[in-house]
């Protein structure tokens, strides 16, 4: 099923992307024309980014970066996104990112579970991790940060 089959016509369309806002569980979904090769857990092309409101504690950024380079956190906007080739893989990536942030899984365990679950998906098996978000997107997630005290004088 394509994004248009599931979510209808995009809210925005440019030469390089299609954008849907507030579609299903997502704050935003973007399908990019530019393909980004990605080899975890197996070679594929990342083209579909999906975004949720989510505040990641600063001390968890390195763990998320080690877990999956296609999971991106924007601290200022309070967003976390996954970019893959299938919506199910984006659900999986974000669900496991939540598991890493909350301490339910280690980085290594999350990577192993991701690889096994994607392999199962390719063989026609499903998992609750592929079917939807297993956490609630947050509210008031933006972090405006602050200027150093030395600049406040």
Where do the model's predicted regions map?
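Non-cytosolic coordination micro-motifs
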Residues: 1-28, 32-153
């Amino acid at each position: 099923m394509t994004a248009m089959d599931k979510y209808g016509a995009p809210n925005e369309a440019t030469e390089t992307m299609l954008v849907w806002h507030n579609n299903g569980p997502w704050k935003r979904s973007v399908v990019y024309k530019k393909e980004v090769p990605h080899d975890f857990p197996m070679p594929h092309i990342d083209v579909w980014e999906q975004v949720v409101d989510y505040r990641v504690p600063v001390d968890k950024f390195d763990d998320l970066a080690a877990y999956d380079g296609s999971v991106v956190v924007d601290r200022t906007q309070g967003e976390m996104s996954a970019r893959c080739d299938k919506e199910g893989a984006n659900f999986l990536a974000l669900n496991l990112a939540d598991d890493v942030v909350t301490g339910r899984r280690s980085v290594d365990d999350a990577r192993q579970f991701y690889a096994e679950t994607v392999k199962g998906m390719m063989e026609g098996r499903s998992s609750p991790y592929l079917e939807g978000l297993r956490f609630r997107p947050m509210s008031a997630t933006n972090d405006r940060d602050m200027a150093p005290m030395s600049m406040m004088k």
